[in-house]
């Protein structure tokens, strides 16, 4: 049976500290760092929970002009 899981993708828009601007969106892990394999990404059961993490990140100091976020879904075998 396939179920839908959600992943947060991010892309840095400006240079900030050790971050350099990125051309493409990357899946993010639990700590908000880009991962090379999608299996290492942080998965969320609902879209709302993933969006809630983005909202918390925005209120704790990462503005929209610095990092862009997207929530995408993937069908996973269970």
PLM regions and their residue ranges:
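Short, mixed-charge low-complexity intrinsically disordered segments
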Residues: 40-78
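Short aromatic-glycine-(Arg/Gly/Cys) micro-motifs in beta-strand/loop hairpins
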Residues: 2-40
């Amino acid at each position: 049976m396939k179920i839908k899981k959600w992943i947060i993708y991010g892309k840095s828009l400006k240079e900030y500290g050790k971050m350099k601007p990125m051309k493409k969106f990357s899946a993010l892990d639990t700590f908000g760092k880009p991962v090379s394999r999608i299996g290492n990404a942080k998965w969320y059961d609902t879209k709302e929970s993933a969006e809630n993490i983005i909202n918390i990140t925005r209120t704790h100091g990462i503005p929209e002009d610095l990092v862009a976020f997207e929530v995408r879904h993937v069908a996973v075998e269970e």
